[in-house]
Design a protein with these regions (language model features):
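Extracellular jelly-roll beta-sandwich "head" domains, especially the C-terminal globular C1q domain
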Residues: 62-215
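Extracellular repetitive beta-rich solenoid segments
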Residues: 1-65, 105, 112-114, 129, ...
Length: 215
């Protein structure tokens, strides 16, 4: 096996070994003409790429998760239907947002940038003699002019009297391609009056979002 050693003046150095297996033909790797910048990585350029020839270029490294945010309702809401429109706060217990974070106004949320987002909503409620409780995600892609139901989820609540508890959650991936016009909020619906629990120190009812990649 052939090797090239780039020797340091003190004796040791860096060794470049030949391939572990014999290629079907010679392979040409063309190095970049610049040194790149801090944080960049070497990648194969799309131009002039083939099974035996590749040009290398410096490119930005994958950013990973650049946005993470969490919100919750701070006080109880008792109703049979309506919108989770009031008493929202950004979670401040063992949490700090990553990136810019969501913006919220009267329960309507907006994303800070385009991307593929994981959205999770969870809720806890209790009622007296109710059969079901549900949460509906409403989404607008035209800056709030029109909303459509994107996800709707219900839980069965056993009719057994006072303080019959239930939980409803929503998980969805949202491909946000025009964040300036993308908005969402949550409705609730039940067979009778449900008390949806909220607390400034506990995530009884709330949401979190993660930007997991580019659109």
């Amino acid at each position: 096996m052939g090797a090239i050693k780039l020797k340091h003046t003190s004796g040791n150095g860096t060794i470049l070994n030949s391939p572990a297996a014999n290629p079907s033909s010679d392979i040409t790797l063309k190095l970049p003409s610049t040194t790149g910048s801090a944080g960049q990585v070497l990648s194969v350029a799309s131009a002039n790429h083939s099974s035996t020839n590749a040009e290398l270029e410096f490119a930005a490294a994958a950013a990973g998760i650049t946005e993470a945010d969490s919100w919750r309702i701070t006080s109880n809401l008792s109703s049979s239907s309506g919108t989770f429109s009031a008493n929202w706060e950004r979670t401040d217990t063992e949490f700090n947002k990553l990136g810019t974070g969501l913006t919220e106004s009267s329960g309507v949320f907006s994303f800070p940038s385009n991307g593929l987002y994981l959205l999770h909503f969870h809720s806890t409620g209790a009622g007296n003699g109710d059969r079901y409780m549900g949460v509906i995600l409403k989404v607008s892609t035209d800056n709030g002019a029109n909303y459509s139901t994107r996800v709707e989820n219900y839980a069965s609540v056993y009719n057994s009297g006072n303080n019959t508890w239930g939980n409803v959650s929503i998980d969805v991936l949202l491909d946000v391609t025009n964040y300036a016009d993308f908005k969402f909020y949550f409705n609730h619906s039940s067979s009778g009056t449900i008390t949806w629990y909220g607390d400034t120190n506990n995530q009884w009812t709330g949401l979190y979002t993660l930007r997991i990649g580019d659109t």
